[in-house]
């Protein structure tokens, strides 16, 4: 090897160090955000010394941080020693930008970063790490996420920022105009619901979330005196009576929960969903086989550290939806980080009498999580039987991304699953 040329060993070592130092890169970004450096630079070219004087900080530390930001492409250095924001920072890191991601990044810098410091413990235990990260034992992960009003607002603002970038895309992946009543389940600040109301003015839209979240949304996220474009309804979607709707939106909800809780929730939604209705699921879907993409794998680890669930493959979401009575699922990638899945309502899961015959099929009984006993699980399950479900590939963007479970043929048996035993007769029009 010629002197000065990088060999394979050197390249591998450079890659290794890049991976090992990744946390330092994140902390440079997080510290600059926390100190407000990008907001200061948004006012015009600014010298590191002036920034240090404004904040009362170490001149040397400020200079080092701003130089690191420059090398990372977050700031631009001028020949006179001043700094300005890069285009990326002006778009995503300045407080007043319509596309700012500042609050989401600050949430990652705090609660999320703290949980990731205990990744090895999370892998050993297979559970969230709030007790180590923030000193709260969290059987219900949202009691830790919403552990104080400032934390609740930071999390809600972070999600609002996410939907400012991605909301329109996932809401137009399918034409939702035929759904007259739309409910955004776990809709937080109402950002996604308000975008739905704007895109589909003929529909009535509501947000359903926990009482403290709804109170915060009304206080901090609605313009004073303005008539809101959506309704806000308070409740617990595992315990409370759910509003009736033609379409339920679950945006980044199912990945919070294990399979039993997902089927429990989806079963409750089946009973609240009107005939001909559907679910719109928004998730970072894993590729077939679950080996990627990397972002979804990292998010799945994050769900282990911060919640009870994980990211899933499209077939996993199809199976969960089918068990709860939403047997036809379409998947689309509208651009951006998330997939959109439309799962259409079928007959109620449980005992179904075949049309034109006296044959019956027995559905399964899945209770999921007992909410009255923290941390308790129920393994009770009945039996499932029946035939007649067929699969056909859905061609999207040139490849088969998922299969669609079609309606059973007349006279066939269908096994379903819900969070309690149900029975009914399969009638014409149930399969929409």
From Swiss-Prot:
The gene is Asmt. Keywords: Lipid metabolism, Melatonin biosynthesis, Methyltransferase, S-adenosyl-L-methionine, Transferase. Catalyzes the transfer of a methyl group onto N-acetylserotonin, producing melatonin (N-acetyl-5-methoxytryptamine). Signal peptide: none annotated. Pfam families: Dimerisation, Methyltransf_2. S-adenosyl-L-methionine binds at residues 146, 163, 209, 235-237, 252. Substrate binds at residues 256, 302, 306. Belongs to the class I-like SAM-binding methyltransferase superfamily. Cation-independent O-methyltransferase family. Homodimer. It comes from Rattus norvegicus (Rat). Pineal melatonin synthesis is severely compromised in most inbred strains. In many inbred strains, genetic defects in ASMT have been identified. Melatonin production may have an impact on gonadal development, testis development being significantly promoted in melatonin-deficient C57BL/6J x Mus musculus molossinus animals. Pathway: Aromatic compound metabolism; melatonin biosynthesis; melatonin from serotonin: step 1/2. This is Acetylserotonin O-methyltransferase. It catalyses: N-acetylserotonin + S-adenosyl-L-methionine = melatonin + S-adenosyl-L-homocysteine + H(+). GO terms for biological process: lipid metabolic process; male gonad development; melatonin biosynthetic process; methylation; negative regulation of male gonad development.
């Amino acid at each position: 090897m010629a002197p000065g040329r990088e060999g394979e060993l050197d390249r591998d070592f450079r890659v290794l160090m890049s991976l090992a130092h990744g946390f330092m890169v994140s902390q440079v970004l997080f510290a600059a955000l926390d100190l407000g450096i990008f907001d200061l630079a948004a006012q015009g070219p600014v010298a590191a010394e002036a920034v240090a004087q404004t904040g009362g900080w170490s001149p040397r530390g400020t200079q080092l941080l701003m130089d690191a930001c420059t090398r990372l492409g977050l700031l631009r250095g001028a020949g006179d020693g001043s700094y300005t924001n890069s285009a990326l920072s002006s778009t995503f890191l300045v407080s007043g930008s319509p596309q700012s991601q500042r609050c989401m990044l600050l949430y990652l810098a705090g609660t999320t970063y703290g949980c990731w410091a205990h990744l090895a413990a999370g892998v050993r235990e297979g559970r969230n790490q709030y007790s180590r990260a923030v000193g709260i034992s969290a059987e219900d992960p949202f009691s830790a996420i919403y552990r104080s009003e400032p934390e609740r607002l930071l999390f809600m603002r972070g999600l609002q920022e996410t939907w400012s970038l991605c909301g329109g895309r996932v809401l137009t992946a399918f034409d939702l105009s035929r759904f007259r009543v739309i409910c955004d389940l776990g809709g937080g600040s109402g950002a996604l619901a308000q975008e739905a109301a704007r895109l589909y003015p003929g529909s009535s839209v509501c947000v359903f979330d926990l009482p403290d979240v709804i109170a915060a949304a009304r206080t901090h996220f609605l313009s004073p005196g303005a008539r809101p474009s959506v309704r806000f309804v308070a409740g617990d979607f595992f315990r409370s009576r759910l509003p009736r709707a033609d379409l339920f939106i679950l945006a980044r909800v199912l990945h919070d929960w294990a399979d039993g809780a997902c089927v429990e929730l989806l079963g409750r939604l089946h009973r609240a969903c009107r005939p001909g209705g559907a679910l719109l699921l928004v998730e970072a879907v894993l590729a077939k086989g679950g080996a990627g993409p990397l972002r979804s794998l990292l998010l799945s680890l994050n769900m282990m550290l911060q919640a009870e669930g994980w990211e899933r493959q499209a077939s996993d979401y199809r199976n969960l939806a089918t068990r709860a009575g939403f047997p036809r699922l379409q998947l689309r990638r509208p651009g951006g980080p998330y997939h959109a899945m439309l799962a259409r309502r079928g007959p109620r899961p449980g005992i179904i009498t075949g049309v034109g015959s006296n044959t019956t099929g027995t559905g399964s009984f899945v209770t999921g999580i007992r909410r009255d006993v923290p941390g308790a699980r129920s393994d009770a399950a009945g039996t499932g039987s029946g035939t007649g479900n067929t699969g056909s590939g859905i061609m999207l963007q040139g490849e088969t991304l998922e299969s669609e479970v079609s309606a059973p043929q007349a006279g066939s048996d269908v096994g379903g699953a819900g969070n309690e035993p149900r029975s009914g007769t399969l009638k014409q029009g149930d399969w929409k």
